Amino acid sequence: MPQFFRTQPLTDRTTSHGFAEVSSEDHCYCVWLVPAISSDIELRYRTFVDWAVCHKVDFEEMQLPTAPHITLARGIKLKPNQSFKSVLQYIASKRKSPLNIKFGKVAIGDSFYKRVYIQVEKTPGLEELQNAAYDLADTSDPFNVIEHPYMPVIYAKSICSDYSTSDPIETISSIGQASWGKACFLELIQLNKANHQGYVCDRIEFTV
């Protein structure tokens, strides 16, 4: 079975080998790119978590990602009993270019999972991974379509405060100013659309 993780920051997630279950409209599979725990960006994210917890009242039903990550794709289609690792291995095999991860500005989105996020430049390496992921995805549902990879930092239904001031913007922007590091993980996540809970199905490691 996949490993359950709560919507709490910095949960220690371990690989759990498994296979796809019967598909359901209640959940979808996503692909994340996650830095190593020892990376500068992970350490910077911990500082951000402290800030975010103190500003929880500024957001409606705020949740935090379990770790800093770049969301590449949603709606990955798996066949019954297909191994999670085989999906990740296929996606990783299509990358021919360096990832060369570059962050842009802090932005406010129009959905729960993209309420506050950091823009990510679609470099050739990231585009290769994303295109490979969408080879396996159902793009008929607009929810699944992600045109540009991004790093979500706050999940929420809405923002209840003015976030045009410099303090929150500088605090959130500091995450994108950190180094991603040389190693990272490609993860397959099973997401429950109703309660926003998820499972780490499997992960593979590769160099940037």
UniProtKB/Swiss-Prot annotation:
Source organism superkingdom: Eukaryota
Gene Ontology terms, MF aspect: 2',3'-cyclic-nucleotide 3'-phosphodiesterase activity
BP GO terms, sorted: cyclic nucleotide metabolic process
Record Gene3D superfamilies: Cyclic phosphodiesterase
Assigned GO CC terms: clathrin-coated vesicle; cytosol; nucleus
Family annotation (SUPFAM superfamilies): LigT-like
PANTHER family named among the record's database cross-references: 2',3'-CYCLIC-NUCLEOTIDE 3'-PHOSPHODIESTERASE
Name of this chain's protein: Uncharacterized protein UNK4,15
Lineage per the UniProt record: Eukaryota, Fungi, Dikarya, Ascomycota, Taphrinomycotina
